[in-house]
Amino acid sequence: MKSEQGLSKVLSLRLDKKTSVIVFLAFAAAYFCSALVRAITATLSPVLTQDFGLQARDLGLLAGGYFFGFAATQLPLGTWLDRYGPKRVILCFLSLAVLGCVAFSMATSFTSLLAARVLVGMGVSACLMAPLTGYRRWFDASALLRANSWMLMTGSLGMLASTLPVQWLMPLLGWRPMFWILAVMILTTMG
């Protein structure tokens, strides 16, 4: 009897096709942004080096700061996803990413750049696990496999977007406005 109630509850959480597509696109857009902000500092390293007088170790710390923020949230993330659900968790986390992007664009020192990168890392740390948790709850088995693989592809596209497109936009916009644009992109995924 108890297992039937559990199965009934799981089946009642399944989404219809249209809602599934909307949910996937929202999560995929967030994961795209996550991968983009993860890799963008490598593309911007010459400009950041020039503007802040950074050395190779500083660039390494900027990259590491992102991963430190990301890693710091991983243990509690699983509990929060189970307790509050993927939607609520990713929205809270993405708010941190928006703040981090804005702080990065306004940074005046290496320390403020590093703090902003840690905040961004924390903010996007749920961008893969929240969707995978949601898909497991809301999609049937065949849709789950497709959604998971498409999510990983979306992340790869985000990494690609951090290279040539960013290099093309740099002379037009500069790196600070690009982080404002990233903040707006992340806000848009939250909508």
Task: Give the residues covered by each predicted segment.
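Cytosolic juxtamembrane N-terminal segment immediately preceding the first transmembrane helix
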Residues: 2-30, 34-35
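Extracytoplasmic
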Residues: 22-54
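Residue-level signature of mid-helix packing/kink "hotspots" within the transmembrane helices
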Residues: 39, 67-75, 159-160
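Conserved MFS/SLC helix-loop-helix module at the cytosolic interface between two early adjacent transmembrane helices
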Residues: 72-108
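Paired small-residue
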Residues: 100, 111-119
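Cytoplasmic helix-loop-helix junction between adjacent transmembrane helices
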Residues: 116-154
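Helix-loop-helix hairpin linking two adjacent transmembrane segments in secondary transporters
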Residues: 151-191
